[in-house]
């Protein structure tokens, strides 16, 4: 450990082009309650695209993206009791919170108003946070989770964001009961994990998509019980009032009213996708039948650990395409075109340093 911090190598965006290239920087000195982690794999989330292209207007360049991190502990501070060197661990969307607000007190650190996000955030010392497209992380132990040995580390990486984003509201709103009927809207990175968790909970799962071509994927590859095209008026009408709950994972603008019609009275819809345009929600659509609509943003540390433990017990991992670091820009371009089944994961430990050396010599 260097006196002034740990030398780190990452791949960073430097402007709104979003193009990533090698970037050397320094992680903070390991503190008493810190865990130092060698990054093995990091998933690519659509949020990373928003950040590196400054689509949310808050990019702090240069910025290293990545918040779906799986790695191995290489060092711990003197006060660390939860982890030891050699443990396989994960880091998700945030790496710190205030610990003093109402949300933190109730165990919902993910809703802390001053939560420190893993990439493109500002820590409590004023430094910009750099994410998991890097070879090393230094994180407080309370924001690190244990990854079960039964999970493949590459397939586990997207669980740190996409997995907990669907798992958390399913448990929170009782959409995890055997025999209940769950609708999963969208069959992408979030949706395919919603199907997997729903089936593991013993639920009847119907995939709802605007793309009829995804029927085979939903029923064959993922084992959903039924498929419903949102463009099929007759099919939608026949399925009215049949579902106990719906997880809406779609990030493109779409009408909610046809989806709400699928819910039984007192049914629950949870929105986890984030369309850029405001969603339209006429009051009558929820008044009739006493239906409820909620949102969800990732999950707490405890929820993330519970999700990983459940995934480990039931063999749930993301379906991933692993890419080398020198292919990350191409992967980001494909993600922008929705050309992935279902998540990209970067092989950080296996390819980063070779990719940086090749970039330096070119």
Swiss-Prot record:
The keyword Cell wall biogenesis/degradation does not apply. InterPro entries: ADH-like_C, ADH-like_N, ADH_Zn_CS, CAD-like, GroES-like_sf, NAD(P)-bd_dom_sf, PKS_ER. Pathway: Aromatic compound metabolism; phenylpropanoid biosynthesis. It is an enzyme of class 1 (oxidoreductase). Zn(2+) 1 binds at residues 45, 67-68, 161. Pfam families: ADH_N (PF08240), ADH_zinc_N (PF00107). Gene3D superfamilies: Medium-chain alcohol dehydrogenases, catalytic domain, NAD(P)-binding Rossmann-like Domain. It catalyses: (E)-cinnamyl alcohol + NADP(+) = (E)-cinnamaldehyde + NADPH + H(+); (E)-coniferol + NADP(+) = (E)-coniferaldehyde + NADPH + H(+); (E)-sinapyl alcohol + NADP(+) = (E)-sinapaldehyde + NADPH + H(+); (E)-4-coumaroyl alcohol + NADP(+) = (E)-4-coumaraldehyde + NADPH + H(+). GO terms for molecular function: cinnamyl-alcohol dehydrogenase activity; coniferyl-alcohol dehydrogenase activity; zinc ion binding. PROSITE patterns: ADH_ZINC. Coiled coil: none annotated. GO terms for biological process: lignin biosynthetic process. Its cofactor is Zn(2+). Binds 2 Zn(2+) ions per subunit. Keywords: Lignin biosynthesis, Metal-binding, NADP, Oxidoreductase, Zinc. The keyword Electron transport does not apply. Homodimer. Belongs to the zinc-containing alcohol dehydrogenase family. This is Probable cinnamyl alcohol dehydrogenase 8D. The lineage of its organism: Eukaryota, Viridiplantae, Streptophyta, Embryophyta, Tracheophyta. The gene is CAD8D.
